[in-house]
Structures are given as C-alpha cells and as structure tokens.
Amino acid sequence: MIQMQTNLDVADNSGARRVQCIKVLGGSKRKYASVGDIIVVSVKEAIPRGRVKKGDVRKAVVVRTAKEVRREDGTAIRFDRNAAVILNNNNEPVGTRIFGPVVRELRAKNFMKIISLAPEVL
C-alpha cells in the first residue's frame, strides 16, 4: 500500500537509490498503489554518474510492498520493504538490471521486460 510521501527503495541500476511517491496514477481520487501500479516519484538519493539524478521526477512501477498482496488461491505474499523500478515515458525500465524478487502480478499488467530481467519471480 503505497501513498503520497511514501519512501521506496529502487530495485534497478538506473542510478537512483531511494525515491518518494508524489502521486498515485489512475484517477483523481485514488489514494493507494499496490504491486504493479504506476506512481510518480521524486528521486531523493542517487549515485554519481547514474542515469537519473537527485531531484528528477519520473514514473515508477511498484514491484514489492510491505503490505501483503492477496492472490486468487488464498495465499498472500509480502516483503520487508517497499521497492519500485524507474520507468521511462514508454513505461519501459530505465535500468538494465533488476535486483531482488518481483511478484507474478506484474505479468498480468504487461511488465514483461521487468519479469524477464528479474532474478526471481514469486
């Protein structure tokens, strides 16, 4: 459950280390984002010589949440920390590597590039 002002780790090699959610996309009254939802983020911490800089405003897709994700078969999956992957304007990942596991729900939302780059899909 990601809302405005939520800090997230960045799970790719785009150069950002930590981002803050500044908007949940998908309707003017929408308050929360879950796994697979696109949000607008501000880069709060970045590494030198990365593709994104501190202060950049980018789109990102949520790939891990501390709030559990319930599935059709009754199982639930949750993570220790919230994480996102930075996207470009075509909703493709800026980075070329994904760190850590991602959830299967991204496949239904057509983030195939992230699924293929991820080391583990849960």
From Swiss-Prot:
Keyword presence, Repeat: no
Parts of the chain that traverse the membrane: none
Gene Ontology MF annotations: large ribosomal subunit rRNA binding; structural constituent of ribosome
A GO cellular component entry from the record: cytosolic large ribosomal subunit
InterPro entries attached to this UniProt entry: Ribosomal_uL14 (IPR000218), Ribosomal_uL14_bac-type (IPR005745), Ribosomal_uL14_CS (IPR019972), Ribosomal_uL14_sf (IPR036853)
Keywords: Ribonucleoprotein, Ribosomal protein, RNA-binding, rRNA-binding
Quaternary structure (record): Part of the 50S ribosomal subunit. Forms a cluster with proteins L3 and L19. In the 70S ribosome, L14 and L19 interact and together make contacts with the 16S rRNA in bridges B5 and B8.
Protein name: Large ribosomal subunit protein uL14
Taxonomic source organism: Ruegeria sp. (strain TM1040)
Top-level taxonomy: Bacteria, Pseudomonadati, Pseudomonadota, Alphaproteobacteria, Rhodobacterales
